[in-house]
C-alpha cells in the first residue's frame, strides 16, 4: 500500500539517496542542492518542503516544493514551483496521489512547473493547468557550427541516445575579458542597481534576499552590460549540451534594465566572446521575446511539449502571470 506524507528539511538525507537512484547523480551533489533549497528565503510554514510516497516504509517517490514570490508592483503573491518529481518504476501509480497532495496548495497559492516533460505535461493538463504561451520552444543562435553538426551525426548514427548528465555542468571554457560585459562579483553592488518591479503583470520579485540566494549562493554571478545607449544587468547559465556534452551553450536567463535595440548585435557578440559559446539561447516564454531587435538574431527550436505550466484556479494572479527563467529552479 502506498502512503503519502509531507516532507521537511529534515528529510534531506533519504531524499538525496532516492534522487540519486533516479537521476544517476551523486548523493553529495544532490544533498548540497537540497540544502540550498532548504535555505529559500521565500519559504513559509504553510508550505512543506515537498511530498513523498512510501511503500512498506521505503521511499519510492518524491516531489520538492519551491515557494517563489511574484509581484505586480503593488501586491506580492507566493507561487509554488514543483521540481524533482520522481517516482520509482516499480510504483508508477504513486505519482497521481503525490500530485493531488501538491494540487491542494492551489486553494491558496498559484502552482507552476518550469521544466515539464511530455508525461508531467499531461498530468498538469489533466488537472486543469494551462501551458504558458511560448514555453513550447526556445530561441537559439548557432555561433560555431561544428559541434552542432557533430551532434546531428551522433544522433543519427549512435546507438546510445540518452547518456546520464554529469553531476555538475562545467562552463564552456575559461571566461575571457570583455570591456562592455563584466561580472559583478559583489552581491551588494549588484543589489543596489536592481530596480523594483513595475506595476503590471506578476513577475518574479527581485528583492535582495532572492537575488542573493538564487544567484550568488548558487555560485552564479550577475554581469553588467554598459554602452553609451545601454545599461543593464544580465544573468547567464553555462552548460554542456549534446550527446557527448560537446556543445558549449549559454542561456540568457535574465536581462534587467535597458538593452538598446541598436546594441543587440554587440550584446550577442560580447556573450560569444566572453564564454566562447557554440550556442546562445533563451526561453520562448521569456520577456526577452518582446525585443524584435534581439529575437531576429535567433531561430526557434521547438520542444516536444510546453515546458511551463500554471495552475491558478482562484485567479490569484489575475491572469497576469509573467514567467521568468530565474523562477525555475
Regions of interest found by a model, annotated:
Residues 7, 11-64, 69-72, 127-253:
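Amide-forming acyltransferase catalytic core, primarily the GNAT-like/NAT-type
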Residues 67, 110-170, 216-217, 235-329:
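Active-site/acyl-donor-binding loops of N-acyltransferases
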Residues 60-98:
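Long, hydrophobic/aromatic-enriched structural stretches that serve as scaffold segments
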Residues 19, 84-86, 256:
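Short, histidine-centered active-site or binding-site loop motifs used for metal coordination
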Residues 56, 106-109, 229-231, 275-278:
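Short glycine/proline-enriched coil/turn segments at helix->beta-strand junctions
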Residues 87-105, 261-273:
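Conserved acetyl-CoA-binding loop-helix of GNAT-fold acetyltransferases
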Residues 50, 62, 79, 109-112, ...:
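Beta-sheet entry/capping signal
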Residues 1-4:
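Extreme N-terminal starter segment of soluble prokaryotic enzymes
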Amino acid at each position: 500500500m502506498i502512503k503519502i506524507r509531507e516532507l521537511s528539511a529534515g528529510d534531506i538525507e533519504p531524499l538525496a539517496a532516492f534522487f540519486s537512484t533516479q537521476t544517476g547523480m551523486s548523493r553529495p551533489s544532490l544533498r548540497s542542492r537540497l540544502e540550498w533549497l532548504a535555505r529559500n528565503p521565500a519559504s513559509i510554514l504553510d508550505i512543506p518542503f515537498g511530498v513523498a510516497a512510501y511503500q512498506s516504509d521505503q521511499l519510492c517517490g518524491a516531489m520538492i516544493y519551491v515557494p517563489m514570490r511574484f509581484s505586480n508592483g503593488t501586491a506580492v503573491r507566493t507561487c509554488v514551483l514543483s521540481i524533482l518529481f520522481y517516482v520509482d518504476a516499480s510504483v508508477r501509480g504513486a505519482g497521481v496521489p503525490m500530485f493531488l497532495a501538491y494540487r491542494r496548495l492551489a486553494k491558496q497559492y498559484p502552482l507552476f512547473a518550469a521544466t515539464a516533460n511530455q508525461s508531467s505535461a499531461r498530468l498538469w493538463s489533466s488537472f486543469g493547468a494551462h501551458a504558458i504561451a511560448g514555453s513550447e520552444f526556445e530561441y537559439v543562435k548557432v555561433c560555431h557550427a561544428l559541434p552542432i553538426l557533430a551532434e546531428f551525426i551522433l544522433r543519427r548514427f549512435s546507438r546510445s541516445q540518452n547518456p546520464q548528465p554529469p553531476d555538475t555542468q562545467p562552463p564552456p571554457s575559461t571566461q575571457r575579458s570583455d570591456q562592455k560585459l563584466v561580472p559583478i562579483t559583489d552581491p551588494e553592488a549588484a543589489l543596489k542597481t536592481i530596480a523594483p518591479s513595475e506595476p503590471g503583470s506578476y513577475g518574479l520579485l527581485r528583492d535582495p534576499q532572492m537575488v542573493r540566494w538564487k544567484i550568488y549562493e548558487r555560485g552564479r554571478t550577475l554581469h553588467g552590460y554598459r554602452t553609451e545607449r545601454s545599461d543593464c544587468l544580465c544573468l547567464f547559465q553555462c552548460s554542456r549540451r549534446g550527446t557527448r556534452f560537446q556543445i558549449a551553450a549559454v542561456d540568457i536567463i535574465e536581462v534587467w534594465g535597458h538593452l538598446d535595440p541598436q546594441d543587440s548585435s554587440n550584446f550577442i557578440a560580447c556573450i560569444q566572446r566572453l564564454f566562447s559559446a557554440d550556442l546562445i539561447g533563451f526561453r520562448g516564454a521569456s520577456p526577452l521575446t518582446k525585443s524584435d531587435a534581439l529575437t531576429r538574431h535567433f531561430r526557434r527550436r521547438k520542444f516536444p511539449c510546453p515546458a511551463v505550466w500554471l495552475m491558478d484556479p482562484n485567479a490569484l494572479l489575475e491572469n497576469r502571470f509573467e514567467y521568468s527563467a530565474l523562477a525555475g529552479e
